[in-house]
Amino acid sequence: MARKLMARKTPPLVGLDTVQLRVETIWLTSQMDLFVLTDKGEPRITASRASASRVATFGMTSVWLKNSCF
């Protein structure tokens, strides 16, 4: 099943640098069962057991994390 998820094409995340992407990967993997994958250096997201609302929450969280100071 993991291979099917990895092969699935999804839209790239826009405007995130590597550090922000790593922070999101750690947080989202533990909170929402979302996994960020890289395809040719472009960050991409695929969902495992995640509903459409969780994917929408990921998009809003991405913007929030990008605008936050750590």
Curated annotation (Swiss-Prot):
Alters the structure of the nuclear envelope. Involved in the perinuclear-nuclear localization of the capsid protein VP1 during virion assembly and maturation. May contribute to viral genome transcription and translation of viral late proteins. Plays an important role in the release of progeny virions from infected cells and in viral propagation. Its main location: host cell. It is found in: Host cytoplasm; Host nucleus. This is Squirrel monkey agnoprotein. Interacts with VP1. Interacts with Large T antigen. Interacts with small t antigen. Keywords: Host cytoplasm, Host nucleus, Host-virus interaction, Phosphoprotein. The keyword Phosphoprotein applies. GO terms for cellular component: host cell cytoplasm; host cell nucleus. The lineage of its organism: Viruses, Monodnaviria, Shotokuvirae, Cossaviricota, Papovaviricetes. Phosphorylated by host PKC. Phosphorylation alters the stability and may also have an impact on the subcellular location.
